[in-house]
């Protein structure tokens, strides 16, 4: 798998983990963020490249900053 795809999968996994940690279903979180549920699912699987604007929206929904979601989950636990 190309490095770019590996990083997208890691990012998507962090987003999924944080969403679940906060108790949101995929559908509820997508609605909260104003995203389509299927789009969010593709982002979480790493099969969709996420734009900076969408990443900001997702981080707002997760109440974390971009650095937190891109560096890894241990930083989320400190919130």
Which role does the model predict for each range below?
Residues 20, 31, 60:
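Alpha-helical residues within the helix-turn-helix
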